[in-house]
Amino acid sequence: MTQNLWNMTNTKHFITLAFVLLLAMILSGCNEKPGAAQQTRITPAEAQAIAKEAYIFGFPIVMNYKTMWSYSIDKNSPDYKGPFNEVSCAARLFTPDDKAVVTPNADTPYCMFWMDVRAEPLVLSVPEMEPERFYHFQLVDLYTHNFAYVGTLTSGNSAGKFLIAGPDWDAEKPIGITDVVRSETGFVFSVTRTQLFGPDDLDKVKAIQASYSLQPLSTLLGTEAPPAVPEPDFPEWAEGSQFDERFFGYLDFMVGLLGHPAEGDQKLWDDLARLGISPEGDFDFSALSKETQEALKAGVQEGFAEIEAFAEKSTKDPLASAKTFGTRDFLSRSAKDNYQLERSDLLRSAAAHTGLYGNSAAEAIYPAYFTDADKEPLDASKHSYTLTFARDALPPAKSFWSLTMYDGKTQLFIDNPLDRYLLNSTTMDDYVRGEDDELVFIISKDSPGKDLEPNWLPAPDGPFYAVMRLYGPEEAALSGDWTPPALEKDKQP
């Protein structure tokens, strides 16, 4: 009897002790920072693997935020364009003195602006334009997908009103709206290009840009505006943070703006949550163990190395730009068909690394020249070059095409006596034709003489590269049936 009583008493003590320990663990967990809680459920090896995957997925998203911060949030930024939901344009002629943007585009002056369509859609109004003038509004979501275009190749050059809606708007198209385009994210970036025919056309382009406008749908309809959506607590951008552990704090914020995983991303988001990255936005790198912190740093380095390697390989493909920019569906197909990848994250990241906001292939492609026909680097201090188009083999473009020269060291335009930085199809009547009506461009540091100067693209006294731009490429250019001719060195035109 005494023994049984002793057993019962001790059993009660054990049960009580176990309950107290369990309660202490629960209370301790409640007071623990989310990041610290996560580290108990993940090994350093797992953390590094997830960090690498997160980096490749999130790199273009974080770089997109960098643009958002400098263009529309930080009014002290030299790149500040204006607030959200306001069209910001700059019609000007770029020269060698412009050093802020590398590989600048002299064909189509830009408008660049951010839109917040969380509370309600915005209505974009565009004027009627001459049928020969190319223009478009490239619309980019937070993932950096080109989810839609408004412009010459998609909607024509008639005047119109285009409704840009976020993921939560599901009403019918209002009367008076030309078309509706839908973003899967609540913030949208636009790169707007309007063709410039030459220096004498600049005032006309300015007038066209001034007539682009945005307004909330409720303003257009004359109805009461919906309740405002709280403004996010935008984190200040720190340059260089995209290359170290600070990256994960920005990714955590952007995951909050995304709100929920896209189709096919649930497993990735579950993995992100194991690092403490979630829509709640409570990631805390300092709360992680030293081992987990080092694992995340290693994941960043590993992820960036993979992005760099993929980008380097892509530069050897003249049609790379046609494969790495586009809609979500297009990039998913391209990843599988062209690169045998299950996900498109690496395509988006490599594209963001080499140049954010490239066009979808149907709008423009950019064959680039870094080497000559003998695969040797281009250097005008050693050689002159010719680029020859047969009469029936000009670049196949629905709108127009151009060839632009860049200094190989600065990646900028080259100072030259003609103030000429490109040759394009809008001045075809000015070019000198060969015996078989072929078109031969001359690329050299010295003038080929007055008679051939119309065909001369001045080069620096040193290394250079050139970029061909085809706006509205024909199927032959997209399929590879037409390929850009090679640059021949020291060949007389």
Pin down the residues of each PLM region.
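C-terminal motif of bacterial Sec signal peptides marking the signal peptidase cleavage site
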Residues: 26-29
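A compositional/structural signature for long, glycine/proline-rich flexible linkers
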Residues: 31-493
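Bacterial N-terminal signal peptides that target proteins for export
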Residues: 4-18
